[in-house]
Amino acid sequence: YGKTKDLTWVAGGMYVGNFEKVLFSPATFTAGLEYQNNSLHDVMTGYHRDMKQDVRIASAFVQNEWKMNQFVFLVGFRLDDHNLIDNPIFSPRLNLLYKPSDKLQARITWSTGFRAPQAYDEDLHVTAVGGEGVLIKLAEGLKPEHSNSISGSIDWTANIGHFQTNLLLEGFYTGLDDVFVLEDMGHDQNGNKVKERRNGNGARVYGVNLDGKIAHGRDAALQVGFTVQRSEYTELE
C-alpha cells in the first residue's frame, strides 16, 4: 500500500479568427497559450520509496487552416518549454484533406511529438513478476523520446438501395528516436527487483486499419473492422 498526493492545474487561452483570405484562400487562424503544473509526492513505505516530482510546462501553439474548393490544408506547430528538458521542444504538424465529392475523401497527416523524461502513472505502480515486486527508476541523463508520425486514409460512403454504407481504409507509421526502454538492474538493498528506464536507439510502429459499416436507417446497423499492426525496435535492445 502507499499514499500519493497528485495536484494538477492547467490555465490557458485561445484565439480563433475566420478570415476571408489569407495568402490564397479563406482561412481559420488559431493561436493560444497554455501552462500546466503538476506536483506529485508518492510514498510506498513497504518498498522504501519516497518520490517527489514537480512538472511545469509552458506552451504556445499556432495553426492556420485554408479551405479551398476540394481541399483543406492545415499547418501548425506547438512549442513546449518543459522544466525537465534543457531546450524547448518544437512540434510541427501538417494535414491535407482532399474531398472530390460528398461520398469520397482522402486525408494525409504528418505530426511530431515527444515524451518527457519524467515519471508516469505506470511507474508509480509496483509490477508483479513471478510474485516479486518490480520498481521502475529513471536513468541519470534520460533524454526525451521524440516521435514522427505519418498517416493516410480513404473514406468512402455510398447508398445502396435502402442501405447506407461506409468504408474506411487507413495506413499509419510512427518512428521513435531515443525510445524509452527498461533495463534490468538486479535488486536494491531492500531486495526489490529494479528496472531502469533508459534511452534506446529507436523503434517503429506501423500498420493498416480497415473499418466497414452498413446501416438500414435507424433500425439496424452492422460495423466490422480489423487492425494489423507491427511494433519493433530498430536495433536489438
Residue ranges and their predicted role:
Residues 1, 99, 107, 141-198, ...:
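Membrane-embedded beta-barrel scaffold of Gram-negative outer-membrane proteins
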Residues 1-86, 165-171, 221-227:
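Face-selective signature of the C-terminal outer-membrane beta-barrel domain
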Residues 1-2, 41-49, 85-91, 119-125, ...:
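Outer-membrane beta-barrel translocator domains and adjoining extracellular loop/strand segments
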Residues 5-7, 25, 54-56, 88, ...:
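Residue-level preference for beta-strand/loop junctions
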Residues 7-13, 56-62, 77, 90-96, ...:
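Hydrophobic, lipid-facing positions within transmembrane beta-strands of outer-membrane proteins
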Residues 17-23, 65-70, 90, 98-102, ...:
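Outer-membrane beta-barrel strand-turn architecture
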Residues 67-72, 166-167, 171-175, 196-237:
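Gram-negative outer-membrane beta-barrel transporters
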Residues 104-157, 179:
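Outer-membrane beta-barrel translocator/channel fold
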